[in-house]
Amino acid sequence: MLTGRRWKQLVMAAGLGFVVSAADSVASDWVRFRGPNGTGISTDSEPLPVEFGEGKNLKWKAALPGAGVSCPIVVGDRVFVTCYSGYGVSRQDAGDMQSLKRHMVCLDRADGKVLWERTIDAVLPEDEYSGMGVPEHGYASHTPVSDGERVYAFFGKSGVYCWDLEGKELWKASAGTGSDDRAWGSSSSPILAGQVLIVPAGPESRAVLGYDSKSGKQLWKAEGDSLGNVWGTPALSVVDDQRTDVVIGAPYEIWGINPATGKLRWYCSAMETDQFNSSVLIDGGTIYAVEGRGGGSIAIRAGGKGDVSGSNVVWSGNDSNRFSTPLLYEGRMYLISGGLVKCVNAADGKEIFQGRLTAGGPAAGGPPAGGPGGGGRGRGGFGGGRGGSDYASPVLGDGKIYYVNRAGDIYVLKPGAALEVLAKNRLTADQEDFSATPAISNGQIFFRSSRHLYCVSAQ
């Protein structure tokens, strides 16, 4: 078993003692993967629609310059999303790797108009678009992050980029050019901890990297033997008013890292799996993780020092997800995988209910579910197949849970002690891949497909 003792601290920052808050810069903004500290929960008071689709509560639809599964983020009146083009867009013909480009796109949230776009040549060679890895997600899988003044994007081997909100490039830096053992590509998204940009560059460097967010200077580099098999995104755990930990899941363990220095503060033995696909979830003083491939689930009390396996585990269980991260709301944790919804008590991990997603009413704006969502795509396909239907994670706003599968079926659920499907919606009759987790901000929901960005609101 890999242990936290095999974490290797390589470069330490000096003079960066600070306390980090897990709160985002503006409450109504959605500035990172899954919104405020990765919880997937919007605290906005604006109403959100139950039913929507073509001709109903669809505010706008904007064409994107390429594919991707990264999620949109919302900063003030702007929406940011990353894409890729030129290579690996079609399974039938991957094309020439030399043509691979990355894109950062900034859109006006009012009407979907593109305000600016930046195109980046890929650092080559990339992992090939073949097999069961990269074709599942492509080359724009990392969700950007913003501090309200700048926007940061991680493009794997092509590096880390920082722009101001007007599109001026402020800095760029390498995060390594390695690959994971399976050459599946990378997808972990960057987060901000105060002035430190945290980049989980597992496949690229077998490391978590810390950069000064204003200058791009690398502050520290911390290696872990198992980070090459990590595809999840960290979150911040506020232990007290003097201490915040960066928490990330790794094969067999959960780690708590000092964001100022990259030093490992604590580790906890966890799921029995050699890869970590989902992201940790933090609620108050408890850290939750659910992993796929039979890895199981765990709840850990925040804080501690060194090996906390014998002292901080609140409960552990056998629940598993595939890729998506659970949603925790009012003491209940909702897991969605393979068309099944399972709800467990966050306090003890005991099951509350389990049920299969079915329509709560006629689908709006499209044909019935079950058609392909991007062609016959690996492990059961994107078209509602049992293997490939779940990629995005559930989010919550206006007291309702929103979940989209890869085929583009969008379920609206009522949280509670039993499964209640309020509606099933579709935004398009076309075959598009909806693998990205939605973003919620100020009464609007943003859904990203392989071709378009959609804005839904109660009109």
Language model regions located:
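Noncatalytic, solvent-exposed loop/strand surfaces
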Residues: A22-Q459
